[in-house]
Structure formats: structure tokens, C-alpha cells
């Protein structure tokens, strides 16, 4: 009997795959990730360019955040990431504060504010973040932060996580645009 072909079902939650990459990394690998962090603001602007309010109010998947909430989440998350890096560079294994991203995404501003506000935040944070990342000494990427939920993470791990995070959420938006023909 011939084998039945199963359709490959794409997991809409993870359009670029789940985050699995952990350090330590080479300087070349770090440089590539830092370039990706630097490109993220333009990628988000391109992802939402020309979308109207109804489109921005569309969830990227059933049960998921709207495109608007996704952009606001990235601003919230990457502001926290920038602070976590600064703490990791300047303190001995600091404990970083988690936040309830799901609750934050349901706040009024995350559901209704124009995406341009958070795109501006993403622009500014990423410029400062890249300036910081480009000056971190190789040995300092081995420094750790303690996250109450995720345990000990090196700055290499944080860099990889947030580089992935930017691509992950930009792909949520671009994948919906492709599926919807926008």
C-alpha cells in the first residue's frame, strides 16, 4: 500500500521555529545577531506598512494577539531586554524582573494605541541597544543574569533569544499578510 502523504501543518505560533539557540557564540555569530537586532525596526515598519486599522486589529492566528498588540508587545519586550543587558553588563549576576506579557498585551494602550508610537520606541531602543552591544567585550557575553522563571542566562543567550524574538514576531505579521493577501 502506498504511504499516505500528510500535509505539513505550519505552527502559526512559531513561524521561524522555536528558540533553541544558546551560546557561547563566536564574535562572527554575535556580529550577525547584532546586525539582525539593528535591522528589526525597519523589518517591523515594513511588516505593517500600508495596513489599515481593521487589518492591524486582526489576530495573527486564531487565539493570538492582533498585529497591533504584537507591535506593542515587541516594544515592551525589547525595552525590558535592553534593561536586562545593561544590568547584566554592570552588575554581578543580577536577578531580572519578569513581567506578565499576556496581561500587558490586554491593557487598553496595547489594544488601541497607534502602532507608530511603539515603532518609534522600537527605533530608539534598538539604536541604543546596538550601540551598547557593539561595545560589549567578548568575555562579557559570558556574564549571566538570573530570571526567576527561566533560570540563569548568559548575555550570549539573551542576545540569541531577543534576536530570534524580533524575527519571530515580524514573521507573525508577514505570514498573516501573505495568508490574507494583504
Q: What annotation goes with each model-predicted range?
A:
Residues 30, 35-41, 45-47, 103-142, ...:
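Acidic/histidine-rich alpha-helical segments that form the ligand environment
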Residues 11-36:
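Secretory/endomembrane lumenal or extracellular ectodomains immediately following the signal peptide
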Residues 28-32, 69, 83, 113-117, ...:
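Positions in alpha-helical segments
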Residues 22-29, 107-114, 150-154:
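Short amphipathic alpha-helical segments at helix-loop
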